[in-house]
Amino acid sequence: MGFIYDWCEERLELQSIADDILSKFVPSHVNIFYCFGGIVLTCFIIQAATGFAMTLYYRPNVVEALSSVTYITNEVSFGWLVRSIHRTSSGLMVLVLLLHVSRVYLTAGFKKPRELTWISGVILAICTVSFGVTGYSLPWDQVGYWACKIVTATPEALNNVFPSLGTVFVTLLVGGTSVGQPTXTRFYQAHTFILPLVTLALLLTHFLMIRKQGISGPL
């Protein structure tokens, strides 16, 4: 093990990176309310792990989606636990995210020079809500189906301001003239591929800016 560590250290300088991370100054005013962002990240990691586990059994089509979710819950070993953790941590993630945004806003953490940190955080919040919207419909039961109908019909309101623009958005979301298999495929791809990639990129940007600028001071 020592040989492997020395080999990696010579090429990557891991110790200097670790020293830089561990020696970062933490302001004295930081308290438990500054931990909400870390809790959101923890929830995201749990979501990713449990979500990946369920993709091994989930079938993203309108005929077998509900039966595959039922199979995960009732037949797969600890499947009920994995799904319960996924659902519970998703709700907790949204709740703690609201607390995190409130804390940053109330302590003026969005002001100069941290505007870009705030903007990336807002986009991350939008991604979080999008995770919820797309994931809610994946079981393709009655609740998921009608939730999907409501969500995909909402952009039609844009037609009142920009004629035909809302219709274009609806067509992109639905994948046709009505909610069906193309819709489920789009929601599944967004939930398991597009949104995770965008979120990871934004998280990296968010944390690098926090690392560079430090934690905002007290009011």
Swiss-Prot record:
Binding site for heme c: 35
Extra information: Heme 1 (or BH or b566) is high-potential and absorbs at about 566 nm, and heme 2 (or BL or b562) is low-potential and absorbs at about 562 nm.
HAMAP family tied to this protein: Cytb6_f_cytb6
Topology class, membrane: Multi-pass membrane protein
GO CC, one annotated term: chloroplast thylakoid membrane
Transmembrane helix is among the record's keywords: yes
Subunit structure: The 4 large subunits of the cytochrome b6-f complex are cytochrome b6, subunit IV (17 kDa polypeptide, PetD), cytochrome f and the Rieske protein, while the 4 small subunits are PetG, PetL, PetM and PetN. The complex functions as a dimer.
Protein name according to UniProt: Cytochrome b6
Its job: Component of the cytochrome b6-f complex, which mediates electron transfer between photosystem II (PSII) and photosystem I (PSI), cyclic electron flow around PSI, and state transitions.
Organism listed in the record: Amphidinium operculatum
PROSITE patterns documented for this protein: CYTB_NTER
Binding-site residues for heme b 2, renumbered to this chain: 86, 191
InterPro entries: Cyt_b/b6_N (IPR005797), Cyt_B6_PetB (IPR023530), Cytb/b6-like_sf (IPR027387), Cytochrome_b_N_euk/bac (IPR048259), Di-haem_cyt_TM (IPR016174)
